[in-house]
Amino acid sequence: MRHPPTIVIDTNVFVAALFRKDSHAGRLVEHVRRGRTRMIWHRETKQETRAIVERIPPIDWADVCDLFQKENEFDSPIDPTRFDAVPDPDDRRFAALAHAVGAVLVSQDDDLLGCPERLNILVLTPKEFLERDWWASEWSGTPIR
């Protein structure tokens, strides 16, 4: 049985989606909302996303908070210190989560996109993620560990 692709979404993708629902980021968020893509989150990544979104008017946390479904929460510890190749300590949390659950990290951050081989995770932009034919391939998603 095929499962929806499993992803971790970086904060900048949520911000882009909230500003332009017709963007690649907006389409990706809609895939999550419709169950075509499974978004895994951690308390730390949710806190960062919420803090950033709430600081940027006119976007609204209420427009994305429903995507943080309890059944998709990864509640084990993550180790951002293993990802010191990423300059921004806040971005390391997203890389650590993607690594811990075997998910694709979707980001528009050049620091994350520029070093996936050193992170040992797949990092894609929303456009790159949407251009892959996940639903027709043999790829079946990665269950949470």
Task: Please provide the spans of the model-predicted regions.
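Hydrophobic/aromatic ligand-binding patch that stacks against planar heteroaromatic rings
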Residues: H31, L97, C115
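PIN/NYN-family metal-dependent endoribonuclease catalytic core
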Residues: V8-I9, F19, H24-E54
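Acidic, PIN/NYN-like endoribonuclease modules and their adjacent C-terminal/linker elements
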Residues: D84-D88, R92, D110-R145
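Small, basic N-terminal interaction modules of short regulatory proteins
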Residues: M1-T6, P126
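A secondary-structure boundary/capping signal
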Residues: D10-T11, H42, Q108-D109, T125
